[in-house]
Design a protein with these regions (language model features):
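Short coil/turn segments at alpha/beta junctions that flank glycine-rich nucleotide-binding fingerprints
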Residues: 101, 118-121
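Short acidic-aromatic loop segments in the C-terminal HATPase_c
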Residues: 93, 143-144
Length: 166
Protein backbone atom coordinates (compact mmCIF):
# COMPACT_ATOMS: atom_id res chain seq x y z
CA UNK A 1 0.00 0.00 0.00
CA UNK A 2 1.32 3.46 -0.91
CA UNK A 3 1.59 5.98 1.87
CA UNK A 4 0.29 9.49 1.48
CA UNK A 5 2.60 12.31 0.50
CA UNK A 6 4.15 14.36 3.29
CA UNK A 7 5.95 17.69 2.95
CA UNK A 8 8.76 18.99 5.13
CA UNK A 9 11.55 21.54 4.91
CA UNK A 10 14.51 20.43 2.84
CA UNK A 11 17.80 19.65 4.57
CA UNK A 12 21.33 18.83 3.44
CA UNK A 13 20.73 15.07 3.55
CA UNK A 14 18.00 15.44 0.92
CA UNK A 15 20.43 16.43 -1.83
CA UNK A 16 20.39 13.19 -3.84
CA UNK A 17 16.63 12.70 -3.51
CA UNK A 18 15.97 16.36 -4.32
CA UNK A 19 18.07 16.15 -7.48
CA UNK A 20 16.55 12.80 -8.56
CA UNK A 21 12.98 14.15 -8.20
CA UNK A 22 13.94 17.38 -9.98
CA UNK A 23 15.57 15.43 -12.82
CA UNK A 24 12.60 13.07 -13.25
CA UNK A 25 10.18 16.00 -13.38
CA UNK A 26 12.41 17.94 -15.77
CA UNK A 27 12.87 15.02 -18.13
CA UNK A 28 9.12 14.33 -18.24
CA UNK A 29 7.89 17.90 -18.61
CA UNK A 30 10.68 20.16 -19.85
CA UNK A 31 13.02 17.98 -21.91
CA UNK A 32 10.46 17.77 -24.74
CA UNK A 33 10.29 21.59 -24.78
CA UNK A 34 14.00 22.33 -24.31
CA UNK A 35 15.13 19.39 -26.42
CA UNK A 36 17.57 17.96 -23.87
CA UNK A 37 17.31 15.86 -20.72
CA UNK A 38 18.66 17.55 -17.60
CA UNK A 39 21.66 15.22 -17.48
CA UNK A 40 22.96 16.81 -20.69
CA UNK A 41 22.81 20.29 -19.17
CA UNK A 42 24.57 19.69 -15.84
CA UNK A 43 26.11 16.71 -14.10
CA UNK A 44 24.29 15.00 -11.23
CA UNK A 45 27.18 15.87 -8.90
CA UNK A 46 27.06 19.55 -9.88
CA UNK A 47 23.32 19.67 -9.20
CA UNK A 48 23.80 17.99 -5.79
CA UNK A 49 26.49 20.55 -4.88
CA UNK A 50 24.24 23.41 -6.01
CA UNK A 51 21.36 22.10 -3.87
CA UNK A 52 23.63 21.71 -0.83
CA UNK A 53 24.92 25.27 -1.23
CA UNK A 54 21.34 26.55 -1.47
CA UNK A 55 20.23 24.69 1.68
CA UNK A 56 23.10 26.20 3.62
CA UNK A 57 21.78 29.65 2.64
CA UNK A 58 18.12 29.01 3.54
CA UNK A 59 16.64 31.63 5.87
CA UNK A 60 13.38 33.52 6.20
CA UNK A 61 14.17 34.95 2.76
CA UNK A 62 14.65 31.61 0.97
CA UNK A 63 13.41 28.13 1.81
CA UNK A 64 12.94 24.76 0.22
CA UNK A 65 10.72 21.73 0.80
CA UNK A 66 10.57 18.13 -0.25
CA UNK A 67 7.53 15.94 -0.72
CA UNK A 68 8.05 12.34 0.36
CA UNK A 69 6.12 9.18 -0.36
CA UNK A 70 7.19 5.80 0.96
CA UNK A 71 10.39 7.43 2.32
CA UNK A 72 11.40 8.68 -1.13
CA UNK A 73 11.62 12.30 -2.26
CA UNK A 74 9.09 12.71 -5.07
CA UNK A 75 8.85 16.48 -5.30
CA UNK A 76 10.63 19.73 -4.49
CA UNK A 77 9.83 23.41 -4.08
CA UNK A 78 11.94 26.50 -3.42
CA UNK A 79 10.98 30.11 -2.83
CA UNK A 80 13.05 33.27 -2.38
CA UNK A 81 12.15 36.82 -1.43
CA UNK A 82 12.12 38.93 -4.59
CA UNK A 83 11.41 42.30 -2.95
CA UNK A 84 10.06 43.73 0.29
CA UNK A 85 6.54 42.57 -0.57
CA UNK A 86 7.01 39.81 -3.16
CA UNK A 87 8.25 36.24 -3.06
CA UNK A 88 9.23 34.16 -6.09
CA UNK A 89 8.45 30.48 -6.42
CA UNK A 90 11.80 29.48 -7.94
CA UNK A 91 11.12 25.76 -8.28
CA UNK A 92 8.19 23.36 -8.09
CA UNK A 93 8.92 19.94 -9.55
CA UNK A 94 7.21 16.60 -8.92
CA UNK A 95 8.40 13.28 -10.34
CA UNK A 96 5.91 11.92 -12.88
CA UNK A 97 5.16 8.81 -10.81
CA UNK A 98 3.80 11.18 -8.13
CA UNK A 99 1.67 13.31 -10.47
CA UNK A 100 -1.93 13.32 -9.28
CA UNK A 101 -1.04 12.50 -5.65
CA UNK A 102 -1.42 16.02 -4.27
CA UNK A 103 2.34 16.48 -3.93
CA UNK A 104 2.42 19.62 -6.09
CA UNK A 105 -0.46 21.23 -4.19
CA UNK A 106 1.16 20.39 -0.84
CA UNK A 107 4.54 21.80 -1.90
CA UNK A 108 2.94 24.93 -3.31
CA UNK A 109 0.93 25.35 -0.11
CA UNK A 110 4.08 25.11 2.02
CA UNK A 111 5.84 27.76 -0.08
CA UNK A 112 2.87 30.13 -0.07
CA UNK A 113 2.38 29.69 3.69
CA UNK A 114 6.05 30.55 4.28
CA UNK A 115 5.74 33.65 2.13
CA UNK A 116 2.70 34.78 4.11
CA UNK A 117 4.43 34.05 7.43
CA UNK A 118 7.28 36.29 6.28
CA UNK A 119 4.95 39.20 5.59
CA UNK A 120 4.93 38.97 1.82
CA UNK A 121 1.84 40.18 -0.03
CA UNK A 122 2.34 38.75 -3.50
CA UNK A 123 3.99 35.78 -5.21
CA UNK A 124 5.36 35.40 -8.71
CA UNK A 125 6.81 32.60 -10.78
CA UNK A 126 8.15 32.01 -14.28
CA UNK A 127 7.05 29.04 -16.35
CA UNK A 128 7.75 27.95 -19.90
CA UNK A 129 5.15 29.34 -22.27
CA UNK A 130 4.88 25.90 -23.92
CA UNK A 131 4.57 24.02 -20.60
CA UNK A 132 0.80 23.56 -20.84
CA UNK A 133 0.53 21.10 -17.95
CA UNK A 134 2.28 23.43 -15.48
CA UNK A 135 0.35 26.45 -16.70
CA UNK A 136 -2.99 24.67 -16.19
CA UNK A 137 -1.89 23.67 -12.68
CA UNK A 138 -0.94 27.22 -11.69
CA UNK A 139 -4.13 28.67 -13.16
CA UNK A 140 -6.22 26.14 -11.17
CA UNK A 141 -4.30 27.22 -8.07
CA UNK A 142 -5.21 30.90 -8.51
CA UNK A 143 -2.25 32.28 -10.46
CA UNK A 144 -2.69 34.68 -13.41
CA UNK A 145 -0.38 35.62 -16.26
CA UNK A 146 0.69 39.24 -15.81
CA UNK A 147 1.86 39.89 -19.38
CA UNK A 148 5.61 39.78 -18.73
CA UNK A 149 7.77 37.41 -20.71
CA UNK A 150 11.44 36.61 -21.04
CA UNK A 151 13.76 34.40 -23.03
CA UNK A 152 15.03 31.57 -20.85
CA UNK A 153 18.75 30.83 -20.86
CA UNK A 154 17.83 27.39 -22.24
CA UNK A 155 15.91 28.80 -25.19
CA UNK A 156 12.15 28.63 -24.58
CA UNK A 157 10.13 31.74 -23.79
CA UNK A 158 8.89 31.99 -20.20
CA UNK A 159 5.80 33.83 -18.98
CA UNK A 160 5.33 35.32 -15.54
CA UNK A 161 2.44 34.46 -13.25
CA UNK A 162 1.38 36.34 -10.10
CA UNK A 163 -1.06 35.92 -7.26
CA UNK A 164 -1.86 37.74 -4.06
CA UNK A 165 -1.12 36.05 -0.77
CA UNK A 166 -4.09 37.38 1.21
Amino acid sequence: MTKSVTVREARLGDAHGFVRAYEAAWDASLAPIVGKPLGELASFEARVARFQAAVEQFSANAKGWVAERDDEVVGVAVYARESETTGELRALYVAPDAWGTGAAQALLGAALDAMRENGLEEALLWVGEANARARRFYEREGWSVDGAGRQSTLGPVEVRYRRTLS
